[in-house]
Amino acid sequence: MTYIQHYDAPLGRILLAADEVGLTGLWFDGAKYFADGLPDEHTERETPVLSEARRWLDLYFAGQEPGFLPPLHPAGSTFQQAVWALLLQIPYGQTVTYGELARQLAEKQGRPRMSAQAAGGAVGHNKISIIIPCHRVVGTGGSLTGYAGGIDRKVKLLALEQADMTRFFVPKTGTAL
């Protein structure tokens, strides 16, 4: 069974979803891929997993590094799971490029190289935004591209984490936003 709750964050309303194992989704209302993978049958109810996720978000939006993860249970391919596991290793307030992420994944898998676009595709289909920190992945040279919650939110999330914002720029309309 899937359970849902809403969370009113400073950057907009968030839909949280969980099953008995862990958090399965966290989406900003109106985001690209909103509620992607959410079963048609779900119940709005408090669960220990959703309570932990809300506690994590409370700390995060208060400007603190939470220091723990709620139980996570993202559904995805083996490749997506590998990319999402790497996202969880990006430190609070730090960023990596899509190319760096692809190189890390290739190294872990014993491959000579990996496509940054392939890694970016998995990053873009992360169903547990913020907690699995896809907003910490940036384009080459600091280009802030590719956040399903919107570039404005990506900027605000990185600023909240006190990332060095002088290194980043928002590309012109029409370039991989």
What are these regions (language model features)?
Residues 5-10, 64-177:
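Nucleic acid-binding interface residues in structured DNA/RNA-binding domains
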Residues 15-16, 25, 97, 146:
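A sequence-level detector of short linear motifs
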